């Protein structure tokens, strides 16, 4: 058990201790992490984050330049998502963004026993949101292709429904729900639709421009009232950098509370976290400005092409098969004796994700063809 030290250690000794204690950690540079939705941040983002690490957007009056840049980031993300004027923040991640959306829907609704309809494929952050906010979660069934059954969503709408959730890039399979149909449904019943595009938000716009056949998912659809989009996933920003964008200012106002004591002056604060790293915002701004649409499209092109190649290789194996054809840069497959296969692959050092009966590989920017070929060699040996 560690005790608070009476005397400090020399700087180099502390760094050496840290190096030793973290040797067991997998790193993105190791070439072994294949199951994470995060990646090694872009080198420019690392430089910017380190340079502005003291900025605190929890007290924006002290950092008006950083506050203005956050507004520009929200404007650029809104533009990417086909919204002329959006309202939101860069937050700690998709979990906080999803909780904020549910909180906004609940606060605006007058339902006595609020309910949220969401797919069975939805992220666990909504379970947290339901517990924290006193919102009952009503789970909609999935179709055979693992997208939400829109008819089941409609069947579960009631007077207590405060919102509907659609997923643009499910955690396990990368499935994009039929957001256009959900949008039509939301408009018909006058219910706001939240799209969790924590992963897909930095993939789908660029993949569609490359010719991939993917459904619309963003503010182009009039029923969509809010979107979660995470720059610290395919956006290559440093952790933490999630994003929440609302179509209308009323949602942001509905979750804002007054913080009157701040050194920079009183401010209305909508995020869950008070202290909030401005460095994350500045890194996101720098990346978007540096890479632009063309830069991100190239990142997505490589990821999508590699994922399709891998899917075809899985089809060649006797004892492994795809769960479904990939929609985004996520490929999930099943095997005989799955738990045994998973244990052996992890014993060989692979950082993979196995849940709900399949192994998931996420083709993030740090994943190379050489890495995947090595993984396939190990997989073939394990499957023998």
UniProtKB/Swiss-Prot annotation:
Leading EC class: lyase
GO terms, biological process: carboxylic acid metabolic process; coenzyme A biosynthetic process
EC number(s) from the headed UniProt entry: 4.1.1.11
UniProt KW keywords: Decarboxylase, Lyase, Pyridoxal phosphate
Pathway in which this enzyme or protein is active: Cofactor biosynthesis; coenzyme A biosynthesis
Requisite cofactors: pyridoxal 5'-phosphate
Annotated InterPro entries: GrpII_AminoAcid_Decarb, MfnA, PyrdxlP-dep_de-COase, PyrdxlP-dep_Trfase, PyrdxlP-dep_Trfase_major, PyrdxlP-dep_Trfase_small, Pyridoxal-P_BS
Reaction equations catalysed: L-aspartate + H(+) = beta-alanine + CO2
NCBIfam families xrefs: tyr_de_CO2_Arch
Protein family membership: Belongs to the group II decarboxylase family. MfnA subfamily.
Role of this protein: Catalyzes the decarboxylation of L-aspartate to produce beta-alanine.
Name under which the protein is recorded: Probable L-aspartate decarboxylase
